[in-house]
Amino acid sequence: CIRDRVATVRKHLPDMYRYVALRKRILGVDELHYYDVYAPLTKGVSAHYTYDQAKQMVLDAVAPLGEEYGTIVRKGFAERWIDVFPNKGKSGGAYSGGSYDSNPYIMCNFTGTLDSVSTIAHEMGHSMHSWFSRHTQPAQYADYTLFVAEVASTVNENLLIEHLLAEKNQDCLLYTSPSPRDCS
């Protein structure tokens, strides 16, 4: 229900205001613009992950969603549903798409950052949503709205963050972008 959504947003507004105030203070700005959300808050801290490490991080993160979910994510990795690396002429960004009679496919530009790992988790959430919709519903009901689509993708992202917080030294996690970076 829309009233529940609005109530939930209102309930969490103080947290958002606190985050904005903190980010403004750290960045030394009076007004926070959209691009400021992506500005790093620390200097000289970075981590690099291989694609194999990224796949394992995503698989570990989505484990709470059950064996079937994990098996299909593994299948997606094994069957190369993902066009992973940047190439000349390849567009930027990341997308998940496909048709009712095909597997979902992901286009991304993995660079080894934690943000790239988070992007794979996010896009795999879209792909899993599509896979389950297409395998459990007739074609006329298998599509979904953008609002609904973002639920599955952000759940995967949040599971990744929760997994990192549980597995890593919390002092080592720094929020340098919308996603945490670990200093392994």
Which ranges hold each PLM region?
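Single conserved hydrophobic/aromatic residue that forms the stacking wall/gate
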Residues: 1-2, 175-183
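Contiguous, non-catalytic segments that form substrate-binding/exosite surfaces or channel walls
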Residues: 3-105
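A sensor for short, sequence-defined functional sites
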Residues: 65-69, 135, 172
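Short pre-active-site segment immediately N-terminal to the catalytic Zn-binding motif
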Residues: 107-120
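Catalytic glutamate of the conserved HExxH
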Residues: 119, 123, 127
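Post-HEXXH active-site segment of zinc metalloproteases
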Residues: 130-151
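Post-HExxH zinc-binding segment in Zn-dependent metallohydrolases
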Residues: 144-171
